Amino acid sequence: MGHKVNPIGLRLGINRTWDSRWYAGADYSRLLHDDLKLRAHLRRKLSGAGVSRVVIERPAKKPRVTIYAARPGVVIGKKGQDIDVLRKDLTRMAKTDVALNIVEIRKPEIDATLVAENIAQQLERRVAFRRAMKRAVQSAMRLGAQGIRINCGGRLGGAEIARVEWYREGRVPLHTLRADIDYGVATAKTTYGTCGVKVWIFKGEILAHDPLAQDRRAAEQAPQR
């Protein structure tokens, strides 16, 4: 079963927690739709900032949006101009004041979402897929990952028949619930069609029951801005 399901969904409440953290009654669907719109807008607006994930919390007064990005300077802009514009955009979309936090990802090479997006961008630039996969694996292992697996599927290299190629190094225990496994997907839009990229990164085991382990680790590595 561990090989079939999303590794993050399987570990929710064990060593991962939700990216949308709020409760709602009758207006649940509206708030969920708002979250989707906010995330889509941020992905589109901050495509060059290396955004890994967006956490949305809704306390009693105003929503709080936390952006985990590899290049926070792109988000903030000169003298904080860009972040002010972004905050106004989010406030207009949410129809209420929004608190905005930026957290820097110090090691983007071991963030599964960023690794997948990087490989997808290389495929779009016609870099050989095996070279892109191998380079990503070597970088992740050098920076402390205990294991990594990368899947690329589609018309790789412009082949007539689509296929799936994968590369793995170290161990990636998908059945072990206490394993801290990061998972990311990305799509490369090539001239031959779309290619899917999936990345699993094993960072070690979390022995204690700690759903907020990922957030705590990110906060320790970089102060919030």
From Swiss-Prot:
Q: Which GO terms describe its molecular function?
A: mRNA binding; rRNA binding; structural constituent of ribosome
What quaternary arrangement does the UniProt entry report? Part of the 30S ribosomal subunit. Forms a tight complex with proteins S10 and S14.
Keyword rRNA-binding listed? The answer is yes
What name is this protein filed under? Small ribosomal subunit protein uS3
Q: Which PANTHER family does the UniProt record give?
A: 30S/40S RIBOSOMAL PROTEIN S3 (PTHR11760), SMALL RIBOSOMAL SUBUNIT PROTEIN US3C (PTHR11760:SF19)
What is one GO cellular-component annotation here? cytosolic small ribosomal subunit
Classification via SMART domains: KH
Family statement drawn from the similarity comment of this UniProt entry? Belongs to the universal ribosomal protein uS3 family.
Q: Which InterPro entries match?
A: KH_dom (IPR004087), KH_dom-like_a/b (IPR015946), KH_dom_type_2 (IPR004044), KH_sf_prok-type (IPR009019), Ribosomal_S3_C_sf (IPR036419), Ribosomal_uS3_bac-typ (IPR005704), Ribosomal_uS3_C (IPR001351), Ribosomal_uS3_CS (IPR018280)
Q: Which residues form the KH type-2 domain?
A: 38-106
Q: Does the keyword Cytoplasm apply?
A: no
User: What is an annotated GO biological process for this record, any one?
Assistant: translation
Q: Which gene encodes it?
A: rpsC
| Keywords assigned by UniProt, alphabetized | Ribonucleoprotein, Ribosomal protein, RNA-binding, rRNA-binding
Q: What does this protein do?
A: Binds the lower part of the 30S subunit head. Binds mRNA in the 70S ribosome, positioning it for translation.
